[in-house]
Regions:
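A structural "flexibility-hinge" signal
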Residues: 1-169
Length: 169
């Protein structure tokens, strides 16, 4: 079972269930959205972690904000705290243009509306942050190894370009 499968099956599928309730989508749509978003979000994190200037602030956001509690309690993903942490991570990792392209690509690939995708991105980023934080805290792996394993190809720029090509294509 891969890391993405571990994330999706955490809590016996409670994450997918929470997203279906929170956004009024089906389980298949939630799974598709997570499966599309996580590699691209991880790619952005991977690029930021490789940048020595940004690495420490991103690591601090991931490891000091209590994010692992969201991995353990998916029902809290809709809380104001979860949304605030997800938005903070997103703004630290992506510029506005890259985030807009990512959201458009995810909407196109999953068939979800752009409003739902834009609302889901901070929640999925919080989920990803919690998953990373929890696994790194266990001491079994490094943040960069986890992010690298979850990232799609060459990172966010490649993911955004690939998604943009599919949208405009």
């Amino acid at each position: 079972m891969g890391l993405l499968d571990n994330l999706l099956s955490a809590g016996s599928g409670a994450i997918v269930t929470q997203l279906t309730k929170q956004f009024g989508i089906t389980g298949d749509q939630a799974t598709s959205a997570i499966s599309t978003m996580v590699p691209a979000l991880a790619g952005g994190l991977k690029e930021k972690l490789a940048d020595s200037q940004a690495s420490s602030s991103i690591s601090q956001l991931l490891m000091s904000g209590g994010l692992n509690s969201f991995a353990d309690n998916p029902s809290s993903l809709g809380s104001p705290s979860a949304l605030a942490q997800g938005k903070s991570l997103l703004s630290s990792v992506f510029g506005g243009e890259d985030l807009t392209k990512l959201a458009s690509g995810v909407a196109e690939k999953t068939g979800l509306g752009s409003g739902i995708v834009n609302s889901m991105l901070p929640v999925v980023m919080t989920l990803l942050g919690g998953f990373l934080s929890k696994n790194v805290a266990s001491g079994k792996t490094s943040l960069m190894d986890l992010v690298g394993n979850l990232a799609a190809g060459p990172g966010i720029l490649g993911a955004v370009k690939s998604l943009a090509q599919k949208v405009t294509g």
